[in-house]
From Swiss-Prot:
Named cofactor requirement(s): FAD
Family matches, as NCBIfam families: PRK00711.1
Name the UniProt record assigns to this protein: D-amino acid dehydrogenase
Source species of the chain: Cereibacter sphaeroides (strain ATCC 17023 / DSM 158 / JCM 6121 / CCUG 31486 / LMG 2827 / NBRC 12203 / NCIMB 8253 / ATH 2.4.1.) (Rhodobacter sphaeroides)
Superkingdom assignment: Bacteria
Enzyme class (EC, first level): oxidoreductase
Pathway field: Amino-acid degradation; D-alanine degradation; NH(3) and pyruvate from D-alanine: step 1/1
Coiled coil stretches, renumbered: none
Lineage of producing organism: Bacteria, Pseudomonadati, Pseudomonadota, Alphaproteobacteria, Rhodobacterales
Signal sequence residues: none
Role according to the record: Oxidative deamination of D-amino acids.
UniProt-listed GO biological process terms: D-alanine catabolic process
Any one Gene Ontology cellular component term annotated for this protein: plasma membrane
């Protein structure tokens, strides 16, 4: 089968690799000059199935109001005259109930755990090196209230059979000795022993190279304009460099996915949520993190990547803005300096921002659409690196008509249809805009 994958981030590249491995003729189209140059470029670096959680959670609306007045707020909302933003925020609110949170987290952990296993398989079969470490991650709580609130997450972890350790302050220091100077600011932690870390950019570029050696064609510097539709079926994609015909098209364009499928009558509830990172060279290895420490107060992950520390996180709902406010850099620097003071040279930090494609329930959209020939693998939010390998394997199985190894029916776009109604396409493209 001829398959065109739109997007060369970690999700698109892993999809292309799995589809080629299954015997398909695959072409990847991306506007950038190489793979992983947008959201996959400098993310926080953690592969954290156990930490997979929706942003929509009980108590978040009240916290969001308090965060409005915090200097180092983990969430910033910049209201816009944007109907998509309003729909997204209202849908987030609807998912802030205990029942919705438990369902969404369980679904996310299921996919993330499977994805970690698929990544282990990829690492073994390809030999790729990407500054990976298999030493768990530590969710750090600065207050007893945060520690107590972890109870609902622990219930989901137990139900899913995910290994964890609930630690006091001394236990946190045993896991991460570099925290010793911050002991008086630690109430406890939740250590997820099966989690990993690694450089998403290095992995994606390496896998793209292997995929190309295996026959996948990459068309970089090529902008996607519109899907080609004939007889109610997607038959290819029109780009700035011509039309690519296909038996199937996979949309893995992150936050840009909704605009592409909207003319086909599909409302895809994916919205860009801006995240930030700084990358700092290590100058004192004894003070640096061993793996990933997630600062629960500021929603910031501090990760060791070889000889560097990656500090990433926060969330800013501001449309497609790519500005780099100094205040966001200050928050990242404050967090790493507070917990791992002296570990890195902040004067040489590089500052980056990316747009995470978020869904209201935190779960990506993976699978077929009501439009024949059109498939989705998008909406992974902050967990694209964590979920990419598993999402790609699930998608490949579905395209080939195989039953995936995990439950996947609740990963598709159908879950957003109104109760009692199936999502239906409304293909109304102007024939004059289609390729002949």
């Amino acid at each position: 089968m001829r398959i065109v994958v739109l997007g060369a981030g970690v999700v698109g590249v892993t999809s292309a690799y799995e589809l080629a491995r299954a015997g398909h003729e695959v072409t990847v189209v991306d506007r950038q000059p190489a793979a992983a140059l947008e959201t996959s470029f400098a993310n926080a670096g953690e592969i954290s199935p156990g930490y997979a959680s929706p942003w929509a959670a009980p108590g978040i609306p009240a916290k969001a109001l308090r965060w409005m007045f915090m200097k180092h707020a983990p969430l910033v909302i910049r209201p816009r005259l944007d109907a998509a933003q309003v729909r997204f925020l209202l849908a987030i609110l609807r998912n802030c109930t205990p029942a919705a949170y438990a369902q969404n987290k369980g679904r996310m952990v299921r996919l993330a755990e499977y994805s970690r296993d698929c990544l282990t398989d990829l690492r073994a079969t390809t030999g790729l090196a990407f500054d990976e470490r298999q030493q768990g991650t530590l969710q750090l709580f600065r207050s007893q209230k945060q520690l107590d609130a972890a109870a609902r997450d622990i219930e989901v972890l137990r139900a899913g059979g995910v290994p964890f350790e609930l630690l006091d302050a001394d236990g946190c220091l045993a896991a991460e000795p570099g925290l010793r100077a911050a002991r008086d600011r630690i109430a406890g932690g939740l250590r997820l022993t099966g989690d990993e870390t690694g450089d998403c950019f290095k992995f994606t570029q390496g896998l793209a190279g292997l995929a190309e050696e295996g026959g996948v064609r990459f068309r970089y510097g090529t902008g996607v304009e519109r899907l080609r539709v004939e007889g109610g079926r997607v038959t290819g994609v029109e780009t700035t460099k011509g039309t690519f015909l296909a038996d199937a098209v996979v949309v893995a364009l992150g936050s840009h996915s909704p605009a592409l499928v909207a003319p086909l009558g599909l409302r895809l509830p994916v919205y860009p949520v801006k995240g930030y990172s700084i990358t700092v060279p290590i100058v004192d290895a004894d003070r640096a993190p061993v793996s990933t420490v997630m600062d629960e107060t500021y929603k910031i992950a501090i990760t060791r990547l070889g000889t560097r520390i990656r500090v990433g996180g926060m969330a800013e709902v501001a449309g497609f803005s790519a500005t780099l406010p100094p205040a966001r850099r200050e928050t990242l620097a404050m967090s790493v300096n507070d917990l791992f003071g002296g570990a890195g040279d902040l004067s040489r930090a590089s500052f980056w921002t990316g747009l995470r494609p978020m869904t209201p329930d935190g779960t990506p959209v993976v699978g077929r659409t009501p439009v024949a020939g059109l498939w989705l693998n998008t909406g992974h939010g902050t967990l694209g690196w964590t979920m990419a390998a598993g999402s790609a394997r699930v998608l490949s199985d579905l395209i080939d008509g195989r039953a995936p190894e995990i439950e996947s029916a609740d990963l598709g776009i159908e879950r957003y249809a109104a109760p009692g109604r199936r999502a239906r396409p409304a293909v109304r493209l102007n024939p004059a805009r289609q390729a002949g």
